[in-house]
Every structure is written in C-alpha cells, then in structure tokens.
C-alpha cells in the first residue's frame, strides 16, 4: 500500500526533513529500520469530520456535464488559516444564494516554488505572501475548510511532491502540478530541467496512489509565456504519458486551459482540440491573464464575462471566476460578487452547439501541430491521436520517456517564447494575430519540428533581436524573492534593449542584496526589480539598503514594478500613498505597477539617469 509514495519519501528524505524544519510542520520520516512512518492513509479518508477524496471533485465535473455549464473554481487563499477561512465564508455566502457547490482553489504561499533543501534563504525572505502557509493548510481544514466545498491547493514549483504530501496530510481533495513539462512562468528556479520533470512525475505518482484530484498540466501557463495552442497540447499530452506510467485514473486528471474571449471560434476550436486529444476527464477554463482589464471591480466584471461565455459554450467542466486581477488576492466579498456575476452569465447564455468549418479547420491545425511536436520529441513518424492509447506510452519506460522530454526541451523542440529556464534552448518567436490566435513568426518555428505543420503568422512582424547596445547607460533587471513571474520584466527588458541600453538580465528569483551587488559589479546606472507576490515593502528597500552600504545608492536610479501588497485592500492603500507621496517610502525612485507602459518606463527612467548625471 502506497509503495510509490513511500519510495519517493525514502529517496528524498533529506528534502522532506528540510520541508518539515523550514515550515514547522510534522512530515513523514523513517524509523530505525528505514521504513516510512507518519504517512496517512490514502483517500478516501475522513479528515475533520469530512471524507476527503479527489472523486469529490470529479463528481462536480459530472454534474457540470449533466447540467450543461461549468462548476465555478474560485481562487482564494490568505496568509493564515483564520484569514482564509473568514474570507472564504464571505465568498461561500454568495454561492449559497443559488445553492451552488464550488471547487475552491486555496492559493498557497509563494515559497512552494522553492526546494527547501537548496533554497532556504529564498524561502525565508518570502514567507507569508502569495497565499496560505503549509501549517495554515492544515489549520484551515481543521477549522472546517472543504467540508461543503471540495478544495485543492497549488503545488507548482521545484518540489511539488513535497507540497502534495503536506496537502494529503492536511486533507485537501486536489492539487495542481502543471506545467510539468515546461518551467513555470520561465522562472529560474533552483533545479535543472530534468530534475524539474522528475519531481513533477513524483508528484503525479503520489496523486495517483492517494486518489488526489490533480490539475495535471496547463495550456494556460504555456500561453502566458508565448506558447502556441499546438505546442501546449503537445506538452499536455506528454504529461498524460507520464500519468499513464504513474497509474493516474483519468477521472482524477484535469487540464487547465486559457479562454481569451477575443475570438469565440478560436476559443471553441482549442477547447475542442484538447477535449478530442486528451484523456483527462476534466477541463478547467481560466480567463486569460495579461489582457490588462480595467482597474475597477465593476468594469472588470464586464471584461471577464466574455471568458465566462466562452467557457460555457466550450463545454468546460470548471471555470475560474476572476476578481481584482490588477491587485492580487481579492477579498472574499469581491470574489463572491465575481461568482454571482458569473453564475448569472451561465444561467442566461444558451449553448446552441456552434458549428463552423472555421472552427473545424483551426481544431485540426492545433492537433496537427501537436502531433508534429510529439513526432520530433519521440522520434516517430505518422503519429495519430488514435494511436496514443495507454499502451502507446508504455512502449517506453518512465525513465526513457523523461529522457526524451528533457532532450526535446534542451534541443528547442519543446519551446515557448518567454520561457527562461537556464538550461533550455530558446528559438521560437510568436505573434498574437488580429484574430486573437498566437502563431509563429515565419522562420522562428520550433527547432526540429516540421515548419509546414506549425501555424505561422501572415502579418508583418518586427522581430525583437538582441543587438549590441548603442548607448552607454547600463541597467540591471530582475525579479526578487520567490517570484517566478518573469513575463512582465521580460517585456521591460526588450523595451530597454530596443532603446539601445546595455541590459543585464538576472531572470527570476533573486535575493535583493544579490541584485544590488551585481549592479555594483557591472557599474550599472539603474536597477529595476519586480515582485508580483505583494512583497514590495519587504524586498524593495533591501536593494537600496545594500547599495547604500556599498556607497552607490546616490549614483544609481532604483525603480520597481509589480505589486507592493498582495491583498486587494492593502494594494489600494499603497497606490493612494504613492500618488500622494511618491515611492521613496519603499526606497525606490519610481514605481511602475500593473498596466504601466514599457515606453513610459524607458523614458522616465532615462530622464532619471540623465538627472543623476547632471
């Protein structure tokens, strides 16, 4: 019983012990004979008066299919169990208005991204932000969390299997792992790519053996970093191949998908392609990120209603309502209003089962690109969806399949424009065409993949090419803390490079002091740091402090971006403070929040540099 889980614990016992010590929670250990102790029984298992199981979530997916519209999957997790439980009760009150059972996504603390054995310092500087803590997960369930509404925790990062063991002990019905196949948001992380994939596979095995519902992989995250629909489908299918080896029941497997609400035919095509190709029984539709919705909850509701319509028409099993996209973690009341509004959309939109040759053609195009990527990854020819049965994936051992995946990532076969894994080959360039579809720019399709089978843009696209600086000014850019969200700072990097600056780019997850020291070493004129987890007040001043210690603060422009505070109400207070007082209270010369123009950033910081030199 639980043989794979026990084997994984034995193999990674030092990391398990580091997790226990780092987060002050009791974890499984080994007795004097080297056998695992302290591991709870698999689900179904009663925890805090409720029988927990991933099948509670699958039962909701079946309900969605029967009635014809998605179950809502709101995201809400605060730093403590008490806060999370209290805000959740306010959110649940709205669902009670129409007797709806939710699939509650309890967002975890950002430290989940980091290996506790190798990244303790990063963890320590990022505690208490991004969501609920590991000990808070256990306390939340003990308080009654998940008793009516099934819950899942997110476990993305370097060591998802450790987070999932904690969730199993706590009593969460589900979790997420994806993206397994690509580096989450392109962050640097601690590990090499193979370790990332291996740890993802360990997480899948634990879910399979303990009946945990799992969001296996994510079309959404690949889209967010410039992955095409076809590439995302290929990666999700590779994750399903690993799931076959893990023995994961398809009823407990879900794929997360973007819906953009820009082109309904395109959204329907991609949802149908995934439904046709994937064996996972559930699709979780999520409103596309990075569309810069209005910074107002009422106006934002209209923005997200477009995605809710698509989710219903596309037959999603679950849908994540959004509130306060521009400010991080919303209040329970704001999320409750988003749930209420979304349910109104679901209840007043008729699904006419839209059929069109345009949808059919796009669906076929997505599937063909995915098959081309898989052929290049697996060294096959003439691959079809019909051939990809469970037995198909068993022709390789799990180790051999992982080796093929890793080799494809390092060769540029599995590629997306803004992924920044340090040992992955980058080549592709994409364009978001006027019809809302992301396609490759001609000449920049994935390496080793038949270009004729990759959707390519017909638009006139100017490709950003890194070139030698034409100006003497130098700027260091990085995210600080346990933050792997590099999409925004990548855009800023390109803007400064296009303007001729010499850019030193440190990617994601850096200590503030390290950024300052690099700036000193290279003789930078400016430093730009970002954190989207609400750690601005804790981390940004440390950059300036270290520069002061080095005697360089007065010689450098130091600016920041992202979110100063993670919670809706706190972020609003800081925005007002910046408008009245400026950003000096954070030790910054300027702050560029969500929605800032890259061109404005370049101009304003350039003017600041000139003023320093004057």
Curated annotation (Swiss-Prot):
Q: Where does adenosylcob(III)alamin bind?
A: 485
Cofactor note (record): Contains a mixture of adenosylcobalamin and oxygen-stable cob(II)alamin.
What cofactor is needed? adenosylcob(III)alamin; cob(II)alamin
Activity regulation reads: Inhibited by intrinsic factor and iodoacetic acid. Competitively inhibited by itaconate, mesaconate, succinate, 1-methyl-1,2-trans-clycopropane, dicarboxylate and L-malate. Non-competitively inhibited by glutaconate and 1-methyl-1,2-cis-cyclopropanedicarboxylate. Not inhibited by acrylate or by the chelating agents alpha,alpha-dipyridyl or EDTA. Not activated by Fe(2+), Mg(2+), Mn(2+) or Ca(2+). Unaffected by K(+), Na(+), NH4(+), Rb(+) or Li(+).
Q: Which InterPro entries match?
A: Acid_CoA_mut_C, Cbl-dep_enz_cat, Cobalamin-bd, Cobalamin-bd_sf
Top-tier EC class: isomerase
| Pathway where this protein functions | Cofactor degradation; nicotinate degradation; propanoate and pyruvate from 6-hydroxynicotinate: step 5/8
Which EC number applies? 5.4.99.4
- Keyword annotations from UniProtKB, A to Z: Cobalamin, Cobalt, Isomerase, Metal-binding
Q: Which SUPFAM superfamilies match?
A: Cobalamin (vitamin B12)-binding domain, Cobalamin (vitamin B12)-dependent enzymes
Single Gene Ontology MF annotation: 2-methyleneglutarate mutase activity
Q: Which reaction(s) does the protein catalyse, per the Swiss-Prot or TrEMBL entry?
A: 2-methyleneglutarate = 2-methylene-3-methylsuccinate
Gene3D superfamilies tied to this protein: Cobalamin-binding domain (3.40.50.280), Methylmalonyl-CoA mutase (3.20.20.240)
Expression induction per the record is: By nicotinate.
What does the free-text pH dependence field read? Answer: Activity decreases rapidly below pH 7.5 in phosphate buffer, and below pH 8.0 in Tris buffer.
Boundaries of every B12-binding domain copy: 472-614
UniProt record, GO biological process:
nicotinate catabolic process
Q: Self-association or partners: how does it assemble?
A: Homotetramer.
Instruction: Report what the protein is called.
Output: 2-methyleneglutarate mutase
Q: Which organism is it from?
A: Eubacterium barkeri (Clostridium barkeri)
């Amino acid at each position: 019983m639980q043989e794979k889980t026990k084997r994984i614990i034995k193999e990674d016992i030092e990391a398990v012990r580091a997790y226990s010590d780092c987060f002050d929670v009791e974890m499984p250990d080994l007795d004097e004979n080297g056998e695992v102790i302290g591991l709870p029984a698999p689900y179904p298992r009663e925890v805090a008066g409720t029988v927990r199981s991933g099948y509670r979530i699958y039962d909701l997916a079946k309900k969605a299919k029967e009635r014809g519209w998605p179950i809502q999957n709101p995201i809400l997790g605060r730093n403590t169990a008490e806060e999370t439980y209290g805000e959740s009760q306010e959110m649940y009150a709205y669902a009670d208005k129409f007797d709806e059972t939710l699939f509650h996504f309890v967002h975890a603390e950002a430290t989940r991204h980091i290996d506790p054995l190798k990244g303790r310092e990063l963890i320590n500087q990022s505690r208490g932000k991004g969501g609920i803590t590991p000990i808070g997960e256990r306390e939340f369930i003990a308080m009654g969390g998940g008793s009516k509404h099934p819950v899942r925790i997110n476990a993305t990062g370097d060591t998802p299997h450790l987070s999932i063991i904690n969730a199993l002990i706590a009593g969460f019905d589900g979790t997420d792992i994806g993206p397994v196949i690509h580096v989450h948001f392109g962050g640097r992380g601690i590990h090499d790519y193979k370790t990332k994939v291996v740890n993802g596979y360990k997480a899948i095995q634990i879910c399979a053996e303990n009946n945990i519902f799992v969001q296996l992989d994510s079309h959404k995250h690949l889209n967010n970093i410039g992955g095409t629909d076809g590439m995302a489908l290929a990666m999700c299918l590779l994750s399903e191949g690993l799931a076959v080896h893990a023995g994961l029941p398809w009823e407990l497997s879900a794929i997360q998908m973007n819906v953009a609400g820009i082109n309904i035919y395109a959204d329907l095509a991609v949802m149908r392609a995934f439904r046709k190709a994937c064996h996972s029984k559930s699709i979780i539709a999520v409103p596309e990120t990075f569309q810069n919705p209005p910074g107002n909850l009422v106006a934002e509701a209209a923005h997200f209603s477009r995605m809710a319509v698509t989710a219903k028409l596309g037959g999603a099993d679950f849908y994540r309502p959004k509130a306060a996209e521009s400010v991080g973690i919303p209040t329970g009341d704001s999320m409750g209003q988003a749930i209420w509004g979304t349910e109104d959309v679901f209840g007043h939109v008729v699904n006419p089962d839209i059929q069109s040759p345009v949808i059919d053609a796009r669906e076929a195009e997505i599937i063909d690109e995915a098959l081309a990527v898989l052929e290049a990854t697996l060294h096959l020819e003439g691959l079809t969806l019909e051939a990809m049965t469970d037995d198909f994936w068993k022709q390789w051992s799990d180790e051999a399949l992982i080796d093929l995946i890793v080799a494809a990532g390092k060769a540029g076969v599995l590629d997306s424009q803004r992924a920044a894994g340090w040992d992955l080959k980058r080549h592709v360039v994409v364009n978001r065409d006027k019809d809302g579809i992301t396609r490759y720019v001609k000449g920049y399709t994935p390496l080793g993949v038949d270009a004729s089978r990759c959707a390519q843009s017909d638009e006139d696209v100017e490709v950003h090419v890194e070139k030698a600086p034409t100006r003497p000014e130098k700027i260091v850019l990085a995210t600080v803390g346990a933050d792997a969200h590099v999409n925004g700072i990548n855009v800023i990097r390109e803007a400064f490079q296009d303007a001729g600056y010499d850019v030193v780019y440190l990617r994601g997850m850096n200590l503030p002091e390290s950024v300052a020291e690099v700036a000193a070493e290279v003789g930078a004129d400016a430093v730009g740091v970002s954190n989207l987890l609400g750690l601005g007040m804790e981390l940004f001043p440390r950059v300036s402090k270290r520069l002061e210690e080095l005697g360089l603060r007065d010689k450098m422009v130091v600016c920041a971006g992202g979110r100063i505070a993670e919670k809706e109400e706190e972020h609003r207070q800081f925005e007002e403070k910046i408008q009245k007082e400026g950003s000096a209270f954070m030790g910054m010369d300027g702050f560029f929040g969500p929605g800032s123009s890259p061109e404005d950033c370049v101009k304003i910081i350039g003017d600041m540099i000139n003023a320093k030199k004057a």
